Amino acid sequence: MKRICICGGGNLGHVVAGFLAANGCEVTLLTRHPERWSHTLHITTPEGTTLEGQLSIISSTASDVVPQADMLLLAQPGFAIRSVLSELRDVLRPGIPVGSIVSSTGFFFEAMSLLPSTTPLFGFQRVPFIARTEVYGHSAHLLGYKSSLNLAVERASREDANRIASEIQQLFHCPTHLLASHYEASLTNSNPLLHTSRLYDLWHNWQEGITYESIPEFYSNWTDN
């Protein structure tokens, strides 16, 4: 059984933790708010099913959840990455891969400066899921999958990089391809393009006096306009 430590409890942290736990991984969670979490996570899927994942340990202390992990996966905003890496580096076992679901907010640069050179690093070019929390610490929605994933791996031999990519493919049930350099993930930030175009689509016809009966959904009501 693969032992995965998820660091972070946002939308992606909820869905990734629940998804991996429901698919046979032993999942521990590092979060600032352990008291708000249930050990059972319910994740709804686009197919209409609900995944149930059991978290083995939930803690705000890295030494409780990191030492036993076979892989660490950060689900953190950019401003929090440095402090989380600083906390976990002293309890991280040698050679354990550390990765980030979001790589365009400085993960590789911070990890290379803080973690031992023997620590393999990996990061997604795009997030694997569209995720939304329903009830914090209890349930979330997996709203969409990627058809394939691109992964950057650094500080690893080609053989080890291929092994990490293969493990990610198995964990996320999605074809996974290696990028040539972490720069392909670090410098590819899609949100400034996606978010501004979506906001234009929502509001470009707005005029003073126009009101709305409901709050529009950002992703689920996406159009091709």
Question: Model-predicted segments: where are they?
Answer:
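Active-site-lining helix/loop region of Rossmann-like oxidoreductase modules
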Residues: 150-225
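Nucleotide donor/acceptor-binding cores
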Residues: 2, 147-149
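Short, well-ordered alpha-helix to beta-strand connector turns
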Residues: 24, 55-56, 69, 95
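NAD(P)+-binding Rossmann beta1-loop-alpha1 motif at the extreme N-terminus of oxidoreductases
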Residues: 1-47, 66
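Rossmann-like NAD(P)(H) cofactor-binding subdomain of soluble oxidoreductases
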Residues: 73-74, 78-136
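Short acidic low-complexity segments
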Residues: 54-68, 177
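N-terminal glycine-rich dinucleotide-binding loop that anchors FAD/FMN and/or NAD(P) in oxidoreductases
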Residues: 41-60
